[in-house]
Amino acid sequence: MVHDLLRDRADLEARWNPSAYMQFARLRQRPVVELLDNIELCCPERIYDLGCGTGIATELLARRWPLAELHGVDSSVEMLEEAARLPIKASWERANLRHWCAERPASLLFAAAVLHFLEDHGKLLPRLLGQLAPGGCLAAHMPNWRDASWYRLMLDALDSAGPGGASLGSPALRYRLHRRNVLSLDNYYRLLAPLTAELDIWETEYLQVVDGNDPIFDWIKVSALRPVLGELDEEARRRFLDRYLELLHRHYPRELDGRTLFPFRRVFIVASLGR
């Protein structure tokens, strides 16, 4: 029954779904708070929340710096419509971050759980630093999920759930999913240290405790799984979900209290320019 319901909703879930994304709002807010706690700006004039989504981070930015000129940027109309309902003073812009440029130099570029979707960080991050005002700061956190069990299981299902153990989806899709966008911490240091006056890089692993029949799937279907659900046809999607849910249940069993443990690692970067 659960599998059938998930299949029926797959086309919807392949798009950004604000209500589904907000299902774990408290857990998604934790790394935002951790990142904010490590930003030492006093009175930033202009803040851009890149990949603002439903405005989880934007609202916290507005509370921290109520006098700042605040801009939320996202590629999803649905997410921006949800964010625009927040009781905060902010402007909202639809844009693809691959090509986005700030209209005016930023005091703070805040990127919560978005840069890992973009490739070639060796060019991306220097380009973002170039849009900061003197003394400005680029602050980002990114899920470091490439080696996570649930991600490897997703790749396994995609590579072997077809008829006779064949792969599913196009070679281009499998290439994108196998590619690593997030760099190692030392490589971020080597990239950013020559370009910044102050640099702080760290990684945190959260032991997330989640509820529900398929909580791991519920978490990733609105983010990492979107390219898969969006590309596979109905039959391929059925095969993939059958296999993937089986693997998830096996590797993430429920605890005695009925909840599921979901370890999740994130990389944090706070890079500041000199004045």
From Swiss-Prot:
One Pfam family matching this protein: Methyltransf_25
Query: GO MF annotations for this entry?
Result: trans-aconitate 2-methyltransferase activity
Give the subcellular location: Cytoplasm
Q: Which GO terms describe its biological process?
A: methylation
What this chain does, per the entry, is described as: Catalyzes the S-adenosylmethionine monomethyl esterification of trans-aconitate.
- Which family, according to UniProt? Belongs to the methyltransferase superfamily. Tam family.
What is the protein name stated in its UniProt record? Answer: Trans-aconitate 2-methyltransferase
The lineage, from the top, is: Bacteria, Pseudomonadati, Pseudomonadota, Gammaproteobacteria, Pseudomonadales
- Gene that this sequence comes from: tam
